[in-house]
């Protein structure tokens, strides 16, 4: 069987707690600069979780038309700006393309929590006549896909994936499939989240997975014996994907890499005795990419920061690759877990690793907990030629996804 038409990534747009814009984020990440701190956009002291990864340097009014500001939640503002930056990076002008060949495929784990909280407070505080008409869509988990497609006149196949942290991988993979089939010529794909408001935080706390540490430096320690949960964050990334022949024909300035393989699985119900965790998704993604385990240069881990989940992920990696056989990193220790935005940001970061032949560090974690058997890139970047990177993401409730990106050409 012939190999499928390669799909490449030609544009990146990043909005993250430790940097807005691709190069600012990448420089901060390589320097080990964290965007995790005590939450500042509201007073968190009445809550058990007080630390988060906020995008404090982001000013939506500096990037978006004034008419969009009152109708969009913060997560949508992040997504709109990241999409615009990705298109500019790719050198693509949507208005000059076939509008039905342009699609938007995003991931979402929640919706417009901050916008929704504000309007609910109006409803119960001053009456329904004060509630914004924009509430009808600003809260909706699919709104980022809609707003991006409207803003850029992208009328082709569009969708949204709601698989929590795994969603960014699932959206990118589906975009690649549509491009290979010829359903789309160009796709904007990725995810952005922004649920760091009182209502959003309270909705997350019952999971029991959030860190209650008050020191930002010790709050998120995946694979460490001291791990006690993850730090919630906001932001994400958008990517421009297209077929390699299309990128070549238009003489794209940059090809970051290609989307080579993907798989998703779902954990069995507890008590069935069937295996859980991401090992099967990893194997299937490698199979689709036609990559042997020994050819993977780095793994971008899900890194839940929850001891049982960390151990399950480490065991899955050891099962597929062998103990300590492949470098593993978790730069999300500098941003917090961004839910649907997190996996998209990991894909962008993996592509930057391929471009610059360097693996960013995991910060905070002192050393892997005894018995995990992983080669964790700690404290400093590791110079390494990266031709193949694997990104792993797990969503709450049993979602497992894995995506392989490779150097192109």
UniProtKB/Swiss-Prot annotation:
It catalyses: 10 malonyl-CoA + 8 H(+) = tetracenomycin F2 + 10 CO2 + 10 CoA + 2 H2O. It comes from the Bacteria. The keyword Cell cycle does not apply. It is an enzyme of class 2 (transferase). GO terms for biological process: antibiotic biosynthetic process; fatty acid biosynthetic process. Residues 4-407 form the Ketosynthase family 3 (KS3) domain. GO terms for molecular function: 3-oxoacyl-[acyl-carrier-protein] synthase activity. Keywords: Acyltransferase, Antibiotic biosynthesis, Transferase. Disulfide bonds: none annotated. The keyword Cell division does not apply. Gene3D superfamilies: 3.40.47.10. Signal peptide: none annotated. PROSITE patterns: KS3_2 (PS52004). Its EC number is 2.3.1.235. SUPFAM superfamilies: Thiolase-like. Belongs to the thiolase-like superfamily. Beta-ketoacyl-ACP synthases family. Involved in the biosynthesis of tetracenomycin C (TCM C). Part of a type II polyketide synthase (PKS) that catalyzes the synthesis of tetracenomycin F2 (TCM F2), a precursor of TCM C, from malonyl-CoA. TcmK and TcmL form a heterodimeric alpha-beta complex that catalyzes the condensation reactions between the growing acyl-enzyme chain and the malonyl-CoA extender units. This putative ketoacyl synthase lacks the active site cysteine. The tetracenomycin polyketide synthase (TCM PKS) is composed of a ketosynthase complex (TcmKL), an acyl carrier protein (TcmM), a cyclase (TcmN) and a probable second cyclase (TcmJ). TcmK and TcmL form a heterodimeric complex. This is Tetracenomycin polyketide synthase ketoacyl synthase beta subunit. The lineage of its organism: Bacteria, Bacillati, Actinomycetota, Actinomycetes, Kitasatosporales. The gene is tcmL.
């Amino acid at each position: 069987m012939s190999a499928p038409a390669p799909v490449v990534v030609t544009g990146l747009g990043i909005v993250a707690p430790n940097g807005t814009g691709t190069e600012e984020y990448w420089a901060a990440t390589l320097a080990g600069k964290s965007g995790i701190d005590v939450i500042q956009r509201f007073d968190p002291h009445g809550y058990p979780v007080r630390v988060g990864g906020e995008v404090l340097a982001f000013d939506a009014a500096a990037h978006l038309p004034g008419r969009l500001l009152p109708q969009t939640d913060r997560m949508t503002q992040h997504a709109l700006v990241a999409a615009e930056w990705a298109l500019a990076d790719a050198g693509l002008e949507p208005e000059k393309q076939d509008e039905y060949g342009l699609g938007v495929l995003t991931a979402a784990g929640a919706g417009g929590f901050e916008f929704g909280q504000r309007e609910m407070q109006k409803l119960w505080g001053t009456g329904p006549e004060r509630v914004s008409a924009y509430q009808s869509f600003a809260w909706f988990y699919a709104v980022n896909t809609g707003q991006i497609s409207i803003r850029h006149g992208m009328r082709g196949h569009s969708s949204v994936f709601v698989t929590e942290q795994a969603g960014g991988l699932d959206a990118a993979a589906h975009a690649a499939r549509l491009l290979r089939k010829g359903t789309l010529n160009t796709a904007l794909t990725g995810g952005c989240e922004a649920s760091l408001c009182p209502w959003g935080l309270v909705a997350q706390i019952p999971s029991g997975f959030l860190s209650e540490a008050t020191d930002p430096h010790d709050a998120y320690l995946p694979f460490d014996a001291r791990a006690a949960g993850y730090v919630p964050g906001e932001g994400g990334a958008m990517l421009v994907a297209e077929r390699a022949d299309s990128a070549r024909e238009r003489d794209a300035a940059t090809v970051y890499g290609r989307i080579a393989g993907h798989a998703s699985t779902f954990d069995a119900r507890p008590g069935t005795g069937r295996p859980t965790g991401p090992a099967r998704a990893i194997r299937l993604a490698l199979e689709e990419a036609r990559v042997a385990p020994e050819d993977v240069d780095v793994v971008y881990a899900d890194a839940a920061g929850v001891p049982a989940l960390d151990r399950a992920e480490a065991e899955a990696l050891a099962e597929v690759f062998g103990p300590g056989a492949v470098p593993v990193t978790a730069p999300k220790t500098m941003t917090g877990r961004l839910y649907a935005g997190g996996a998209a940001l990991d894909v962008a970061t993996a592509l930057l690793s391929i471009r610059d032949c360097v693996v960013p560090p995991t910060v905070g974690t002192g050393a892997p907990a005894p018995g995990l058997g992983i080669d964790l890139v700690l404290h400093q970047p590791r110079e390494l030629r990266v031709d193949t990177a694997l990104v792993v993401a797990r969503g709450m409730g049993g979602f497992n996804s894995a995506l392989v990106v490779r150097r192109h050409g």
